[in-house]
């Protein structure tokens, strides 16, 4: 979902707590 986390996740992993790689390759708060 949104808002974005300011992180990209080309590897499929988000390192920011509470963020998911959706939609790839952008990390968003779930």
Swiss-Prot record:
Q: Print the keywords alphabetically.
A: Cytolysis, Disulfide bond, Hemolysis, Knottin, Plant defense
Which family does this protein fall into? Belongs to the cyclotide family. Moebius subfamily.
Please tell me whether the keyword Disulfide bond is annotated for this protein: yes
Give the InterPro entries listed for this entry.
Answer: Cyclotide, Cyclotide_moebius_CS, Cyclotide_sf
The record describes the protein's role as: Probably participates in a plant defense mechanism. Has hemolytic activity.
GO process annotations (BP): defense response; hemolysis in another organism
Disulphide-bridged cysteine pairs: 5-19, 9-21, 14-27
The record's tissue-specificity note reads:
Expressed in leaves.
Q: How is it modified after translation?
A: This is a cyclic peptide.
Organism lineage reads as: Eukaryota, Viridiplantae, Streptophyta, Embryophyta, Tracheophyta
The species is: Viola hederacea
Cyclopeptide (Gly-Asn), cross-linked positions: 1-30
Q: What is known of its domains?
A: The presence of a 'disulfide through disulfide knot' structurally defines this protein as a knottin.
- Put simply, this protein is called Leaf cyclotide 2
């Amino acid at each position: 979902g949104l808002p974005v986390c300011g992180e990209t996740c080309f590897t499929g992993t988000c390192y920011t707590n509470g963020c998911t790689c959706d939609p790839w390759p952008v990390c968003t708060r779930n």
